[in-house]
Amino acid sequence: MAKVCYFTGRKTVSGNNRSHAMNQTKRTVKPNLQKVTVLIDGKPKKVWVSARALKSGKVERV
C-alpha cells in the first residue's frame, strides 16, 4: 500500500534544496501520515491518514 492519505490524497512531492550559491540537489517533502483504523463500509480498516485530516475532523477513528 502506497503512503498516500486515504481521504485527502496528500503524498510525497519532490523539489530542490537550494544553497546560497544556488546549487541544487533533489529533495523530497513528505506529509505527516499516521496509520489509523477507520470504518469503511462498516468494517474496520487500517489506512494512512494525514495529520491535517485527523485534526480537521474529516476522519472518525474506531
UniProtKB/Swiss-Prot annotation:
BP GO annotations: translation
Top-rank lineage group of the source organism: Bacteria
Protein keywords: Ribonucleoprotein, Ribosomal protein
Entry GO MF terms: structural constituent of ribosome
Entry-linked Pfam families: Ribosomal_L28
GO cellular component: ribonucleoprotein complex; ribosome
Similarity-based family: Belongs to the bacterial ribosomal protein bL28 family.
Entry protein name: Large ribosomal subunit protein bL28
Gene: rpmB
